């Protein structure tokens, strides 16, 4: 059982295929109805690291802030003479199938996986007021939301109200009207930065999301199964050995996944020798410094020389990476 070292396969496939310099936008759309009411749609495009306040250029987690989006939206609404709206959120990006095989059985308390969503605040983490000082650095696992997009929409509604726009009725799901353009947008950190965050925190939700983004890019099935198929497809196309590979999901949070050390080594070699895998290589935890491998060091002279992806699942402990 590879545990979270499986994430290196997903990371390589995504980095080799997607535009890793691109960002994920969260947007608002306005529909002005014939009865004189205004319907505002909050649409996510995959940013599961939204912040609750102003956009934060200094961090990956919170790079795009719902407070900033609310301020820009409120300004656009007031310019149109609108001071009250009905708010809905569009969470249609990843369809209806959000739970990969193998995860529910291993995560009954919802501390290792938040369902893949078009948007989420801080990956769906609920800190109960004990938020870490640095949003990019933490080592504990709080309970995760099972409805991250809805909770992001509720935060946005609050921020909009604070900026003088009344939100009528409860916040429900809806769709962006055809032919409309966004009135406000905030952008995530780059996919390259998000991948580093995913690998260093061994974030299962983001690992599964990279698989889903890859599947959408390749026009594969919009499902966890489509994500797995897409990763396997890219590995095979790139000549990476998949002999003995059983990939239950994209994160490794599954008891029945299997892969060989040969495949792990193949992936690491490609990361180091091809530009397309650099994001997956550079994002690994740095032993002695950052990520899940920060405290796995016996010799202080080795600090900073080893980049590693750790894996831990029950009695299983695994590791893969590279040495400078």
Model-derived features: where do they sit?
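C-terminal soluble interaction/assembly domains
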Residues: 243-324
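Short, solvent-exposed secondary-structure boundary motifs
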Residues: 18-21, 232, 236, 309-314
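A small/polar active-site loop signature that marks catalytic segments
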Residues: 124-278
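Active-site-adjacent loops and short helices of periplasmic peptidoglycan-processing enzymes
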Residues: 1-142, 146, 164-196, 200-206
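Active-site-proximal beta-strand/loop segments in catalytic clefts of secreted hydrolases
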Residues: 43-46, 89-92, 123-124, 172-174, ...
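Short, mixed-charge aromatic SLiMs
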Residues: 31-45, 222-225, 233-237, 286-298
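Short, well-ordered secondary-structure micro-motifs
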Residues: 52-53, 99-100, 209, 221, ...
